C-alpha cells in the first residue's frame, strides 16, 4: 500500500521541482494536491489518515519554508535552515527533540516490516528502532517538529493519524470482525474470540510507522484494550512516534478502572523513548498581527447584524448562491442551514448540540475554508459533551487551516468555566451504577473534567492563533 499523502511531503517535492524547473515548472505556484477519497471497503482509519495528513500543516508556506523543503535533507537540517532564515528562533528544548527525531529518521531509512508470521518477525535481522513519545504544554512546537520528521522519514509505509480517529477505527474494525464470525447455533455456547491480535496484524500489514497527534486517553473502551493492541503492534515491528500534552504516567489519570490500564504505560515506555518539549513558551500566543476583528461577544451591540454583514461580504466573493447545504458523511446526510461556496454560516447548536463527531467535522473542513460559528456558550461541566465536540471541531478546523469568525458569550480566555463540584452529578452516578463501581473505587476526580480542561488549554491556544493575519492568509484557498 502506498504511503499516506501529506502536504508537507507534497510541498517538499513541489518545492524542489520549483527550484530546479522540473515538474510544476520554474516559478510555478505550489499547490497542495488533494488526496484520493477513501473508497468503498477501505478502512475508516485511512480516512483519518487523510484527515491529519491533509491538514496537518499550513496549506500556504513562506518562501523560506518552501526553500527548506527543497534543499534540506532531514528534520535537523530543516530546523537549522528556519533558524538562519529567522522563521524560527532558537529553542534548546525544540532542538533536543529534533536531534532525536533526526536520529530516528536515519535509523528508519529502508525499514519495513518482514512478511510472514510472528516467528519470522521475532528472528528478523531487520530490528525496529525504538519510537518516540514527545510531550509538553500547548503551543511549544510538538506538531511542528512532527511535521519536520514526517516530511523526511523514508520508509515504504507510514501513516500519520490523530489518536482519537485511530481508536475509533480500531473499534469499528473489531465490530466488523465480530460481525463476520459464523453465527452460533441455538443451544451451543459461543467460543470466546479475541479480535485484538488479528486487528493489530491487519494494521501492521498496512504500515511500518505510525505517527500519532494528540495522544490522549479519555475513553474507558480505549483504555481497556490499549496494552494488548500496542503490544501486538510493537511485536509485529510497528514503530510509533507520538505527541501528547501529558507524560505517559499521567495518561488516563483518575480514569475508571485505571488499574487495568497502567500496564500499557510500561509497554509504551519499553518501545518508545520519552522526551519532554516544554520551553515554557506558547508560540501560538506570540505577538502576531491580528486579522481584524474575528471574535465577537454576544453582549455587544448589533453583533448579529455585524456578523450578517461579514457573511454577506464573504459570500459576494463566491460564485454561488446562499442556500442550505447537504454533505454526505459515511452514508449519512449532514445538513447546514446556510452556506455559499466555501463559506458556511452556522450556529453552535448546529455544530455541537447535535450528535456529530470527527468524521462530520472532517467533511466540513474539506468543503469550507471559512466558517462562522454563532452563539458559542461559556462551557461548564454541565456542557461536557458539547465541550468535547467543540474541541474536536476546532482541532479539525485548525488542522485544515479553516478560518473562523465567532460570536460567543465570553472572551476566548474565559470560554471554559472550571467549576468545583461538591457532589457527583446525576450523570456521574448513573455511569458509576452501570459500571458497578462504588464512589471510592471510581475515583470521583474522574468526573471533574480534568481531561477536558487539559484539552481546552490546547483549544484556547489554537483559537488565539486562528485570530491572526498569518493564519487567515494561510487559510485562503482561493489564493492557491
From Swiss-Prot:
Compartmental location: Mitochondrion membrane
Lineage: Eukaryota, Metazoa, Chordata, Craniata, Vertebrata
Major subcellular location class: mitochondrion
Entry-linked NCBIfam families: ZapE
Expressed in which tissues: Highly expressed in heart, kidney, and lactating breast. Present at reduced levels in virgin, pregnant, and involuting breast.
Function: Putative mitochondrial ATPase. Plays a role in mitochondrial morphology and mitochondrial protein metabolism. Promotes degradation of excess nuclear-encoded complex IV subunits (COX4I1, COX5A and COX6A1) and normal activity of complexes III and IV of the respiratory chain. Mediates mitochondrial translocation of TP53 and its transcription-independent apoptosis in response to genotoxic stress.
A Pfam short name: AFG1_ATPase
A biological-process GO annotation: mitochondrial protein quality control
InterPro entries: ATPase_AFG1-like, P-loop_NTPase
Organism per entry: Mus musculus
Residues holding ATP: 136-143, 209-214
The protein's name: AFG1-like ATPase
Amino acid at each position: 500500500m502506498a504511503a499516506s499523502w501529506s502536504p508537507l511531503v507534497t510541498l517538499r517535492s513541489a518545492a524542489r521541482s520549483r527550484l530546479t524547473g522540473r515538474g510544476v515548472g520554474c516559478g510555478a505556484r505550489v499547490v497542495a494536491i488533494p488526496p484520493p477519497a477513501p473508497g468503498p471497503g477501505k478502512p475508516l482509519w485511512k480516512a483519518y489518515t487523510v484527515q491529519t495528513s491533509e491538514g496537518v500543516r499550513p496549506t500556504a508556506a513562506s518562501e523560506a519554508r518552501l526553500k527548506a523543503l527543497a534543499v534540506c535533507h532531514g528534520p535537523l537540517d530543516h530546523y537549522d535552515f528556519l533558524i538562519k532564515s529567522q522563521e524560527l528562533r532558537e529553542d534548546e528544548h525544540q532542538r533536543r527533540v529534533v536531534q532525536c527525531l533526526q536520529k530516528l529518521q536515519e535509523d528508519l531509512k529502508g525499514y519495513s516490516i518482514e512478511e510472514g508470521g510472528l516467528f519470522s518477525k521475532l528472528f528478523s535481522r531487520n530490528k525496529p528502532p525504538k519510537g518516540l513519545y514527545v510531550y509538553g504544554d500547548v503551543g511549544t512546537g510538538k506538531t511542528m517538529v512532527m511535521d519536520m520528521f514526517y516530511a523526511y522519514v523514508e520508509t515504504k509505509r507510514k501513516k500519520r493519524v490523530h489518536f482519537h480517529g485511530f481508536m475509533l477505527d480500531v473499534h469499528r474494525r473489531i465490530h466488523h470482525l465480530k460481525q463476520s464470525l459464523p453465527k452460533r447455533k441455538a443451544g451451543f455456547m459461543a467460543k470466546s474470540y479475541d479480535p485484538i491480535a488479528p486487528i493489530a496484524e491487519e494494521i501492521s500489514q498496512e504500515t511500518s510507522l505510525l505517527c500519532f497527534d494528540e495522544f490522549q486517553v479519555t475513553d474507558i473502551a480505549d483504555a481497556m484494550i490499549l496494552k494488548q493492541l500496542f503490544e501486538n503492534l510493537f511485536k509485529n515491528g510497528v514503530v510509533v512516534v507520538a505527541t501528547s500534552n501529558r507524560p505517559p504516567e499521567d495518561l488516563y489519570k483518575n480514569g475508571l478502572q485505571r488499574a487495568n490500564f497502567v500496564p500499557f504505560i510500561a509497554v509504551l515506555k519499553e518501545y518508545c523513548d520519552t522526551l519532554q518539549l516544554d520551553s515554557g513558551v506558547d508560540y501560538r500566543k506570540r505577538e502576531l498581527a491580528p486579522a481584524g476583528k474575528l471574535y465577537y461577544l454576544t453582549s455587544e451591540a448589533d453583533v448579529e447584524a455585524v456578523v450578517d454583514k461579514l457573511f454577506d461580504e464573504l459570500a459576494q466573493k463566491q460564485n454561488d448562491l446562499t442556500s442550505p447545504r447537504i454533505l454526505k458523511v459515511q452514508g449519512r446526510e449532514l445538513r447546514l442551514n446556510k452556506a455559499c461556496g466555501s463559506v458556511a454560516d452556522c450556529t453552535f447548536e448546529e455544530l455541537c448540540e447535535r450528535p456529530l463527531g470527527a468524521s462530520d467535522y472532517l467533511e466540513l473542513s474539506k468543503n469550507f475554508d471559512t466558517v462562522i460559528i454563532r452563539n458559542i456558550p461559556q462551557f461548564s461541566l454541565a456542557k461536557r459533551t458539547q465541550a468535547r465536540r467543540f474541541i474536536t471541531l476546532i482541532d479539525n478546523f485548525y488542522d485544515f487551516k479553516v478560518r473562523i469568525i465567532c460570536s460567543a458569550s465570553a472572551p476566548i480566555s474565559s470560554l471554559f468555566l472550571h467549576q468545583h463540584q461538591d457532589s457527583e452529578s446525576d450523570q456521574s452516578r448513573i455511569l458509576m451504577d452501570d459500571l458497578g463501581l462504588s464512589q471510592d473505587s471510581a475515583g470521583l476526580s474522574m468526573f471533574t473534567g480534568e481531561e477536558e480542561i487539559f484539552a481546552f488549554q490546547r483549544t484556547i491556544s489554537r483559537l488565539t492563533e486562528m485570530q491572526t493575519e498569518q493564519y487567515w492568509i494561510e487559510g485562503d484557498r482561493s489564493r492557491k
